[in-house]
Structures are given as C-alpha cells and as structure tokens.
Amino acid sequence: MLSVCVVTVIGGQNPSPTPGDFGPDPTNIPVPTAATAPPAGVPMLPFRFGTRPAPPLGQKFGNVAAVAFTPEGHLLVFNRNAQIEMVEYDATGSTVLRVFNPNIAVNPHALRVDRYGNIWATDAYWNVLWKLNAKGEVLMMLGKRGENAAWSDAAWNGMFNQPLDIAFDQDDNFYVVQGHGGTSPPEDCTFCTTYPYAARADRHAVAARPPVVQGSDPRLMKFDKTGRFVASVSLAHPTGPFATTHTVVVSPTGELWVGDRNAKKLIVFDRNLKRLREIQVGYLTCALFVDAQGGLWMGAGMDGMVFKLDWNGKVLGWFGKWGSNTDSNDIGEAHQLAVSRDLKTIYVADSLNAHVLKMESN
C-alpha cells in the first residue's frame, strides 16, 4: 500500500538520469589535490561486485542518492525517479517488498534509519527534513518547503539551507548538516528528481523561491529528540572553496564526524558542537557510515572508491577503481553507503550512474 504522496506527480516519460547533485560548483575556486589512490601499501578490501538490485515497476532509477538498512536488515533505496523514490528490498536486494512515498522529495539526498526503525530523509532542494515511521507515514517535517532565510544565532528561523545528512546520538538527539555549495536552491534544478513535476517547467514556481545564498550557509545543527533546535555551528571556509558539508555520523565514543567534501577533510566535534580536530583525508569525503561493530567507512564520491578507515582517519583498506567511472561497471559516485550487520554486504548509492551497487565479501 502506498503512502500518501506529498507532492503531486505530473505525467510524462521518465527521461534518462542526469549525473551529479546540483552540477559543478559555480566558481573556479581550486580544491585540494587528491591523494594517490589507492593509497600506497594499503590492501584492497576482500569484496567483489554482486548482482545489483533492479528498479521496480518497469522503471529506471533516477540518480540514486541514498541507501540504508532497516532493523530487519531490509535495504531501502532513495532515488530521483519520483515514481519509485523509495523502494524496500529484502536483505539480498533481489526481491522488491514495496514502493512507497512517491515524489515526497524534489531532490532526494540522505536516507538514514534510527534504532527504532524510523526513516529520516532530506530534500536538498525543498530544504526539508522528513521523519517517517517504518510504514512510511510522516511523523515530523522540519524546515519550510521551498524557503530559506539568512541565519540568526539568536534563534532558529525554522528553515534549512540544503540539508544533506542526519545522525543520531545515544540520547536520540539528532544532528543535521547543511550546505551543498553554490546557491540554494541552484539556479537550474536540472539535477533534481528525474521525473517531471509541476515546478520543473518553471523553476521559479517552487513555492516562495528562496533567496540566493552564495555558499548555502554550511552548518552543523543539533536538535533534541522532539525536534527542538538546540545549537549550531558554522562550517563556512574563511577563504578557498565553498564548504560542502555532505555527511555526518556519530562515533562509538559520541563524537560527531562531519565530512567536508569540497575540502576533502573530516571535522570532529563533541556533542556540544565544540570543534575538536580536523583530519585532511585527501579524498572526497562524500559519505560516512558506522557499522554494527563500530567501524568507520567512507564513500569517496566521484573518486570512485569505498574506504575502511580507523578513528584517526587512516585508510585501512579500499575497494573500487580510481576516478569517476561513467563508462564501466565500477563506482561512478559513492554518494552514500550502507554496511550490513554481519559486514558481508555493502550497498553503494551511485548517483552518477543511477544504480545501486552491491559489494559482497569474498
């Protein structure tokens, strides 16, 4: 049974997926040079590619933004074809269990599942965060759809500016990172959902069009379990490239680890949002995941790699083929990833090639 659609779907043909999130950064500001990949002397992880989950209903995936596991071990896929935006598979990724919440987001970005089985999803264009129960029914929406405003540290204005990822601590506080770089939303949402919707024909018709905010106000925010805003910290760069605060996780010791993709670094905070240290990784810090044994994994975006890290940021192992692999069966963009509880299966959301990759242990 489908959950109620939140945004009206307009009929039409499903076009070919368009690569990327919001397209290239709007400036020619140089970014840090990548490290050598794979890292010298670091072993390849003992994985191979398995059979990819097939999109349902005779559709093609749009750009696949995110993957996550439910407490039962089922696979959830969040992609940018509005007709099949959320899909649930069995643990093997071979059987479709349901398709739900069509067109809940204009630009699906992150998908996380908390310990209670609630599904959290961000829409980086409409500037909202959804909390859904396991059935896909809306429990909470934070943000104002299609709106943003200048930040005030005195009080949260109730608006996000490109929310990108969510993480949870042991007390059920949750943390949101925002700020994809460029304007919010982008001047041309070509890179939004790959199925026609009402605002697509006239991008200026998206609710009350948010003001153009250069750099999109990169920020880490803390909320309590009821959704009450607690605190925030700016992650903007004083000079150099725009910050792209693309991912966040909570470590086994309760630290917050934020991936700044544009700067290719990890920034570590305590639960009070005090900055503790930075780790220059040298790879695109696109996706972070903490496995059931407390291990840290990183998807390196268009570097085409998945890394196993220690909690000092050191690379312990790698898998993939270096580069943005648009013409191969390798990883095009490791936008988000999810590791099974037994550590034997990893699913990768490839937003460039518009499919879900399955990595199986040898």
Q: For each of these PLM feature ranges, what is it?
A:
Residues Q59-E72, N103-N118, E147-D171, P218, ...:
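Beta-rich, blade/repeat-based domains predominating
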Residues I331-N362:
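Blade-level signature of beta-propeller repeat domains, shared across WD40, Kelch, NHL, RCC1
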Residues T36-K60:
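A short helix->beta-strand "capping" segment at the edge of beta-propeller domains
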Residues E85-V87, V128-W130, P218-M221, K265-I267, ...:
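A short loop-to-beta-strand structural motif that recurs across blades of beta-propeller domains
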Residues T51-L57, T95-N101, M140, A150-W156, ...:
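A short beta-strand motif characteristic of beta-propeller blades
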Residues I84-N118, A124, G323:
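Blade-loop segments of beta-propeller domains
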Residues V77-N81, A121-A124, V176-H180, P210-Q214, ...:
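Conserved beta-strand positions in repeat-built beta-propeller and related beta-rich domains
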Residues Y89-G93, N133-E137, D224-R228, D270-K274, ...:
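Short loop/turn segments that connect beta-strands within beta-propeller blades
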